[in-house]
């Protein structure tokens, strides 16, 4: 065990560093829903911090809805309701959801300690450190307008890569002047006060249009996904220490989930290896192409769904067993797996929310640790939004290479992957790693040698780059589609229509959920509260439609949220009539949010933990 790992069990350890994600507005903001909502939402629409948040995300919504609600502009009932729904949708997100964007989803870092209370912290401003960045597409648009067709590498500072290219080009004075101008507009945005931000962004947009002859937005109407030329990142002023008491509590349940994740990833690895060997075995005169094998794996193989069913069956057996062994002991037997897996499957990552009224309540044992999103066979802190803002980036990168091994084979993501931005692009490799471009436009920053996949030859189950003498296992190149298949299909617990909460000790492995076929749900807002009560749903839940990537917060006492929920159900019933909408209890509840700022306001929060499989670390034999 090194200094960067905290022990969990003999097979599992935790990174001492964890990401702390939170909402940017106090959870008490949800009190606006349920009574006299119009007055409450009018106050929200006039709040300077809320207005700034919407300005960063959607200035059209600011002008067409937020401004009108704040002013109480006279209008028909239908238009007023529609505008209030816009305000409500942003407000529920800012108060109830843990994110990593802007000051409405600030990032912080916590530390797992070997002594001290279960949780100790000091919190200040949500936006203690601000930085404004260009979106990748905006800088690429400028590059194209300057006659530089080659793509810009995905990264947190694409303007720097563009500047390097311009400085290498003859007659680049005009290009450098254009970049200087756009950067000056970005600086003005970063320095703008709340009341001047809208104008500063508008000025940047006009300059962008003048320089590129392109519109200053993309994906209009979406709430997520690199829509505007620049974005804001914030670090929260937070010093957080998680003591051994919390870790000891999680050790009674979390390793069972980790064992099942390892088993699941190994089964997916087996599927990928079989597909690879079949493709190699079918070689014709020209031999199989790596691109063809990648194409097979990019589509989630049908066999994965059978493995998911096996995973749920095994968990059902675990949860209904009456043996005297602990859950962790039973899971180690039920999910026994000897590997191997892809290199990064040494990692598994749960998001853990602590449900408690205060840090004092946690120390007194009055808490639940709630497992939320789970990332099998992956380390989400490798994404740029985390990796580039780690307080000790050198130590961060060294830890990954120590645990995974060197060199890491990295398949550069295709540029056309939905939502592939610099914030989600992995940012943990070194120039000495092996970077492979599988598609046109896939590239790395200067100093990171890149190999075109067309230069690679298959030799048995290895890949060879003959001119440089590079050789590595083909399956390592295929690990990216394998772990994406694991993440997209991970669903360990059998659900059915209603699935009760699963609690082991003080650890909640699954919140209570209700899966409702959209076509069977009420379509009218006034019918939804009674329907929910009859099913046993609490007042506050999150709902995930098969048509959406993200869940939304719902309060069944809110007329406005009932209208938006009814619309969601109608759309789902029309588009996917037999697929369920999943409702999940809100846990922690608003009175179980322990993280407070220096004003005493409580915020929703979660710890993004990284678990290390000690049996799979580089240099370890299982």
Give the ranges of each region predicted by the language model:
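C-terminal structured domains
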Residues: 354-621
């Amino acid at each position: 065990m090194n200094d960067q790992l905290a022990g969990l069990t003999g097979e599992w350890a935790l990174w001492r560093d964890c990401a702390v994600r939170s909402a940017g507005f106090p959870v008490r903001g949800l009190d606006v829903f349920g009574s006299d909502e119009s007055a409450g939402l009018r106050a929200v629409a006039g709040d300077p911090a809320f207005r700034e948040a919407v300005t960063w995300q959607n200035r059209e919504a600011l002008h067409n809805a937020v401004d009108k609600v704040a002013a109480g502009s006279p209008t028909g009932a239908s238009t007023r309701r529609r505008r209030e729904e816009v305000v409500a949708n942003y407000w529920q997100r800012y108060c109830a959801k843990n994110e990593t964007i802007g000051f409405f989803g600030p990032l912080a870092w916590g530390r797992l300690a070997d002594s001290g209370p279960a949780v100790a912290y000091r919190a200040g401003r949500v936006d203690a450190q601000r930085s404004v960045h260009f979106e990748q597409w905006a800088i690429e648009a400028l590059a194209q307008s300057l006659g530089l067709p080659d793509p810009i590498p995905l990264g947190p500072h694409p303007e720097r890569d563009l500047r390097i290219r311009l400085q290498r080009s003859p007659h680049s004075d005009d290009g450098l002047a254009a970049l200087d101008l756009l950067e000056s507009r970005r600086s003005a945005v970063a320095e703008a006060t709340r009341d001047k931000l809208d104008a500063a962004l508008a000025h940047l947009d006009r300059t962008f249009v003048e320089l590129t002859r392109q519109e200053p937005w993309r994906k209009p109407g979406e709430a997520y996904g690199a829509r505007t030329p620049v974005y804001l990142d914030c670090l929260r002023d937070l010093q957080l220490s998680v003591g051994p008491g919390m870790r000891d509590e999680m050790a009674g349940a979390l390793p069972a989930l980790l064992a099942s994740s390892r088993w699941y990833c190994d089964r997916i690895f087996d599927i990928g290896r079989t597909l690879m060997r079949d493709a190699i075995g079918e070689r014709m005169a020209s031999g199989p192409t790596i691109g063809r094998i990648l194409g097979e794996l990019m589509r989630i193989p049908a066999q994965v769904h059978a493995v998911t069913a096996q995973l749920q069956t095994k968990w059902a057996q675990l949860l209904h067993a009456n043996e005297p062994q602990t859950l962790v002991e039973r899971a180690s037997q039920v999910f026994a797996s000897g590997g191997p897996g892809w290199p990064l499957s040494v990692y598994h990552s749960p998001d853990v929310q602590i449900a408690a009224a205060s840090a004092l309540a946690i120390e007194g044992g009055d808490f639940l640790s709630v497992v939320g999103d789970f990332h099998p066979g992956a380390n989400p802190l490798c994404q740029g939004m985390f990796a580039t803002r780690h307080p000790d980036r050198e130590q961060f990168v060294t830890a990954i290479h120590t645990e995974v091994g060197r060199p890491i084979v990295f398949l550069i993501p295709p540029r056309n992957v939905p939502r592939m931005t610099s914030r989600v692009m992995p940012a943990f490799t070194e120039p000495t790693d092996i970077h492979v471009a599988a598609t046109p436009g896939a590239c790395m920053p200067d100093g990171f040698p890149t190999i075109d996949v067309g230069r690679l030859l298959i030799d048995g189950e290895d890949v060879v780059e003959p001119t440089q003498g590079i050789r590595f296992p083909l399956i390592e190149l295929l690990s990216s589609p394998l772990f994406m298949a694991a993440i997209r299909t991970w669903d360990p617990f059998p659900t059915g229509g209603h699935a009760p909460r699963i609690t082991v000790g003080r650890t909640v492995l699954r919140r209570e959920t209700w899966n409702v076929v959209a076509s069977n749900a009420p379509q009218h807002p006034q019918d939804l509260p009674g329907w929910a009560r009859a099913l046993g749903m609490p007042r506050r839940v999150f709902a995930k439609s098969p048509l959406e990537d993200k869940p939304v917060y719902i309060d069944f006492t809110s007329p406005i949220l009932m209208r938006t929920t009814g619309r969601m159900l109608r759309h789902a019933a029309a588009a996917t009539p037999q697929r369920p909408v999943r409702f999940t209890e809100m846990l922690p509840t608003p009175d179980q949010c322990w993280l407070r700022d220096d004003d005493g306001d409580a915020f929703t929060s979660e710890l993004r933990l990284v678990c290390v499989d000690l049996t799979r670390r580089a240099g370890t034999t299982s």
